């Protein structure tokens, strides 16, 4: 099987010290979500299976993430990457759209997926546009292990950055991820944007580190930094 950095990363996250925290989210209304490597891999596998089995996603297709920097947005990016999809962060054309605001999605995508951001949401609150998929209601029914139907292409585009760089799947770890020291526990402000959150998270995870992602409404106190043991760079 052809491998790419995203697949290798998910393998590392679910093996070794798989119960250690890898992604911690602080959101509005005192929301705190912590995902170990094993739990993060589980969410990513289920999301990849939803894309592949329910939406017929294949390597080379494009997945637009109209989402803020949030733990579920990181899950979606990883799910797309291990499938070999291109992640689109701007308003460019895409086969699939994952969004927290499906009301204005239009009809230019093969599928629109509504992503409810609250951690405990079991389904979308309110009405959805016709044909829109409810991520919270659907994702839990999908398998915990992802087995790709087709090999990803390492030379295909994984993401285009805000400054116009094209990052191939083969270069996701070396050309997009930001470098962090071994085992670092990195704080990432969500208001720096999703691209920053993804680059920082990939850089931390590939060196056995972890990420604390905080919403702009969350006060970054000395107690929070101490409780989360933020360290390294």
Residue ranges and their predicted role:
Residues 85-94, 101, 216:
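Short acidic low-complexity segments
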């Amino acid at each position: 099987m052809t491998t790419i950095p995203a697949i290798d990363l998910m393998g590392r996250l679910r093996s070794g010290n798989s119960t250690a925290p890898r992604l911690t989210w602080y959101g509005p209304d005192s929301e705190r979500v912590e995902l170990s490597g094993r739990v993060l891999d589980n969410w990513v596998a289920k999301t990849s299976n939803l894309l592949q089995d329910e939406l017929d996603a294949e390597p080379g297709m494009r997945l637009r993430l109209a989402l803020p920097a949030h733990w579920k947005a990181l899950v979606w990016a990883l799910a797309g990457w291990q499938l070999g999809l291109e992640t689109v962060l701007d308003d460019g054309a895409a086969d699939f759209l994952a969004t927290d605001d499906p009301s204005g999605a239009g009809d230019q995508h093969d599928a629109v997926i509504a992503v409810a951001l609250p951690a405990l949401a079991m389904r979308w609150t309110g009405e959805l546009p016709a044909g829109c998929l409810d991520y919270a209601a659907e994702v839990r029914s999908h398998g915990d292990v992802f087995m790709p139907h087709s090999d990803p292409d390492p030379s295909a585009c994984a993401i285009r950055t805000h400054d116009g760089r094209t990052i191939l799947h083969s270069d996701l770890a070396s050309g997009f991820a930001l470098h962090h020291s071994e085992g670092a526990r990195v704080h990432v402000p969500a208001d720096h944007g999703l691209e920053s959150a993804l680059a920082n998270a990939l850089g931390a995870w590939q060196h056995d580190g972890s990420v604390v992602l905080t919403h702009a409404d969350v006060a970054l106190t000395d107690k929070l930094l101490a409780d989360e043991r933020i360290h390294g760079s």
